[in-house]
Amino acid sequence: MKHPQFLPTWSWRLNWDTIRHDLTIGSCPRGPADLDRLQAEARISAVLSLQHDECLEKLEIDYPRLARYGRAQGLRMEHSPMRDFDPEDQRRRLPEAVRILHDLLSQGHRVYLHCTAGINRSSLVAVAYLTWIEGQSLDDAMALLQGARPEVSPYWDAYEGCGQDLIARHADQIRQRIAELSRQNPGRSAKIHRSRAEREMIRTALIG
């Protein structure tokens, strides 16, 4: 798949779309007034920023100050930076972001997940969470995301590469699980057992 790119005419504006009751994706808040608006209009209780320092500097965002303000307003403020337009960096950093998103959602937060434009990195983390943690199919997860925010466009190299890394790291446990599944369900194909074992191991590796 093609990598997403910003249009030359892209300029920042605060915008968001509600994916479901507990997850909203959008562009970055740049100051306290933006957090106030998100809290009042999107009714969020937590913010997960994926912006790298390079993004913050380019947009002149004082993230420590913004985070302090958000916490003072009762928001849970989390930061898991990923480099923009860098699928290799996103591949490495994706597990941490998925873990944080899971932690927030499992505690009942209404999460505002954002990168800079709310197109690439935020959708990458969302689709990884929906498929790897919640067990949705990739088609269903993307239909959910694009149904609410049509412009989302994750780096598939990062998504697939991270999944491959997790599988390779736990190859022995996956083989053991395949053997268990084969004994329990001898009538099913090895392909089905492998797919299930890999899905289970990715989820376990991410959240235990």
Question: Which residues make up each language-model segment?
Answer:
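Cys-dependent protein tyrosine phosphatase-like superfamily
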Residues: 1-111, 125-208
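Glycine-rich nucleophile elbow surrounding the catalytic serine of serine-hydrolase chemistry
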Residues: 119-124
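Short cysteine clusters
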Residues: 115
